[in-house]
Amino acid sequence: NDMESLEAQLKKCEPDKVKLIVTDGVFSMEGDVANLPEIVRLAKKYDATIMVDEAHGIGVFGRGGRGVCDHFGVSDDVDLIMGTFSKSFASLGGFIATDKEITNFLRHHSRSYIFTASITPASTAAVMAALDIMESEPEIQEHLWELTNFALDGFRQMGCEIGHTSTPIIPLFIRDNN
């Protein structure tokens, strides 16, 4: 999430070479949210492609749980959005949302795609049901945020060191063995 470092790396790249910025939407260790608006700005400035892993953002951020890209209104500026169905969807498998050209490339060159089995019909049905619930019952997402804020406030009142998280990922830092 260090934009100065990212820009320094992009400046080092040859202008005519492909540049890929890969980031989590929500970083799983400390719950930091990626600065996607700034990443998009830098990607446009340096003609870079953006890939966002929404594993911890889907179901939590954005309209109907669409993720951090939607939360910041940059979904159309992100070239690849990927995620898992094993967290918010309580199922199996995952997804990559991208354009047709990249999809075809991935289908023909990704070993993990070529040498894997398809998602089962039952897992697909579970994902579809979860999507319907996320869309039709926004109060579930609102309740998640109420519980998150309650937990954050409680940990802070107890004097726990939780860093700067503002997400449901709450790290508890323990600095010694006592």
Residue spans for each PLM region:
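Conserved PLP-binding catalytic core of the aspartate aminotransferase-like
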Residues: 142-151, 157-178
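Structural motif of enzymes handling amino- and sulfur-group chemistry
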Residues: 118-137, 143, 147-152, 156-157
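Active-site phosphate-binding strand-loop segment of PLP-dependent enzymes
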Residues: 1-52
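A short glycine-threonine-serine/GTX helix/turn-capping micro-motif
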Residues: 92, 110-119
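Short beta-strand
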Residues: 19, 82, 116-117, 160-166
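Short, small-residue-enriched loops and turns at beta-alpha junctions
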Residues: 3-5, 25-30, 57-60, 113-114, ...
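Active-site PLP attachment segment
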Residues: 70-105
